[in-house]
Amino acid sequence: MNALEEILDGVRADLAVRERETSLAALKQRVERVPDPRDALAVLRAPRVSVIAEIKRRSPSRGALATIADPAALASLYEQAGAAAVSVLTEQRRFGGSLADLDAVRVAVDIPVLRKDFVISPYQVLEARAHGADMVLLIVAALDQPRLIGLLERVESLGMTALVEVHDETEMLRALDAGARLVGVNARNLRTLEVDRETFARLAPMVPQGVLKVAESGVRGPRDLLQYAGAGADAVLVGEAAVTGGDPRQFVADLVTAGTHPATRIAH
């Protein structure tokens, strides 16, 4: 069993518990009470390389990363630093996240919020909207094609934006075939947990005009952002480096400054 399969086993077990605790009807009632989702695509289309900054306590590859007692405060720092969006990990077993983190972040910031999890069910999509998410991660490697298409349609039917994550050429073709408008290229292979920063440059040329590209994993600082920008990235998603560097606000601010560098506009 590879790393992704192990994570998905835990996700299914935890999902079954939540489905017993909170009915679909209750989730739908909650959706009716939350504010409309923000337009993440409009934000990420800005003439720069945008920064999506992540609330991340743990990872399967590194274990414990940071003690984040107040995710709302960290999200506010990210927003003050100029982040275009905040990513909130809600998977508990391997990443130490929760839907409570999503709730806290949603009320703390005015920028789009991404629910980052291993979404395999329409229930989780409705759950994301009920807890205020504007964006939902869909990982192609975790889904067959009919399920990917169905979940993407469900995300968009609720007014949210799907960030469709891929790791290789086959997955990129599947994402585009499903109708993804925002594609994330993860430099980390979720099956082996190894990072290859050349993955983005290899896959980006496959993406047609009008589909936005996010570089995920491997962003250690402005130099990596500029490298991804040169390969056509519209945004970068950064988690580990932001929470382990000691000054998350300054780290994100430095990335935001790099993202507005004239060289990034030339790359686009």
From Swiss-Prot:
CDD domains: IGPS
InterPro entries membership: Aldolase_TIM, Indole-3-glycerol_P_synth, Indole-3-glycerol_P_synth_dom, Indole-3-GlycerolPSynthase_CS, RibuloseP-bd_barrel
Stated family: Belongs to the TrpC family.
Catalysed transformations (reactions): 1-(2-carboxyphenylamino)-1-deoxy-D-ribulose 5-phosphate + H(+) = (1S,2R)-1-C-(indol-3-yl)glycerol 3-phosphate + CO2 + H2O
Sorted UniProt keywords: Amino-acid biosynthesis, Aromatic amino acid biosynthesis, Decarboxylase, Lyase, Tryptophan biosynthesis
GO terms assigned for molecular function: indole-3-glycerol-phosphate synthase activity; phosphoribosylanthranilate isomerase activity
Classification via SUPFAM superfamilies: Ribulose-phoshate binding barrel (SSF51366)
One GO BP: L-tryptophan biosynthetic process
Entry protein name: Indole-3-glycerol phosphate synthase
EC code: 4.1.1.48
HAMAP family from the UniProt entry: IGPS_A, IGPS_B
Gene assigned in the entry: trpC
